[in-house]
Amino acid sequence: MESVALYSFQATESDELAFNKGDTLKILNMEDDQNWYKAELRGVEGFIPKNYIRVKPHPWYSGRISRQLAEEILMKRNHLGAFLIRESESSPGEFSVSVNYGDQVQHFKVLREASGKYFLWEEKFNSLNELVDFYRTTTIAKKRQIFLRDEEPLLKSPGACFAQAQFDFSAQDPSQLSFRRGDIIEVLERPDPHWWRGRSCGRVGFFPRSYVQPVHL
């Protein structure tokens, strides 16, 4: 996960991470605190205020969802190579890549060197974004030709990709998306008649369809 600093930030506590406007930071954990993310810059980790940064769009990032839910989501996408990246349930800051293999879903643990680089096999990457881009054109599997492919859009009608919250919603588990009445949510997927998947304020998760109204922007 990459983000760009909108403003400079000076750390005032030992666990905070200082950065300058324009810096690109790696987000390690955005699930545990509403206002602070854990991030890394030039090999140093610490907490940063989320309102000082802009998270780059990551439709493939699904947050801390379970392995089972990842499989359910990907098996509903009927194309080989459909994928998502999720945060480990047991080890915050660690990630897995889940990939549709056609008849099943395979999971790859993303490993990290001491220097902070990410890898699955031999190639090393500075960020998850670089890893994803590499495996779009290089097979992620060893015994089959499988390339990462973005989810095919399910929302075809103009203006139907956004919804406005009609009520407050508080997530009951890490896979869900909290929001306040009036918030605008980007709808990423409609895997279920009652639950949609969307993004708001840099977070991605599931929310009840009955709490929102599609809007034209």
Curated annotation (Swiss-Prot):
- By its UniProt entry, which InterPro entries does this protein fall under? GRAP_N_SH3, Grb2-like, SH2, SH2_dom_sf, SH3-like_dom_sf, SH3_domain
One GO CC term, this protein: plasma membrane
Say where the protein is mainly found. Answer: membrane
Annotated signal peptide: none
What range(s) does the SH3 domain occupy? 1-58, 158-217
* One GO term (biological process): sensory perception of sound
Which keywords annotate this record?
Deafness, Disease variant, Membrane, Non-syndromic deafness, Repeat, SH2 domain, SH3 domain, Synapse
Transmembrane regions listed in the UniProt entry:
none
Write down a Pfam family by its short name. SH2
Instruction: Specify the SH2 domain's residue ranges.
Output: 60-154
- What kind of membrane protein is this, topologically? Peripheral membrane protein
Q: Name one GO molecular function term.
A: epidermal growth factor receptor binding
- Kindly list the places in or outside the cell where this protein is found, as annotated in its UniProt entry: Membrane; Synapse
The protein's assembly and partners? Associates through its SH2 domain with ligand-activated receptors for stem cell factor (KIT) and erythropoietin (EPOR). Also forms a stable complex with the Bcr-Abl oncoprotein. GRAP is associated with the Ras guanine nucleotide exchange factor SOS1, primarily through its N-terminal SH3 domain. Interacts with phosphorylated LAT upon TCR activation. Interacts with SHB.
- Clinical note on disease: Deafness, autosomal recessive, 114: A form of non-syndromic deafness characterized by congenital profound sensorineural hearing loss. Sensorineural deafness results from damage to the neural receptors of the inner ear, the nerve pathways to the brain, or the area of the brain that receives sound information.
Q: What does this protein do?
A: Couples signals from receptor and cytoplasmic tyrosine kinases to the Ras signaling pathway. Plays a role in the inner ear and in hearing.
Describe the family membership recorded for this protein in Swiss-Prot or TrEMBL: Belongs to the GRB2/sem-5/DRK family.
Q: Which named protein is this? A: GRB2-related adapter protein
Natural source organism: Homo sapiens
Give the lineage. Eukaryota, Metazoa, Chordata, Craniata, Vertebrata
Question: Gene symbol?
Answer: GRAP
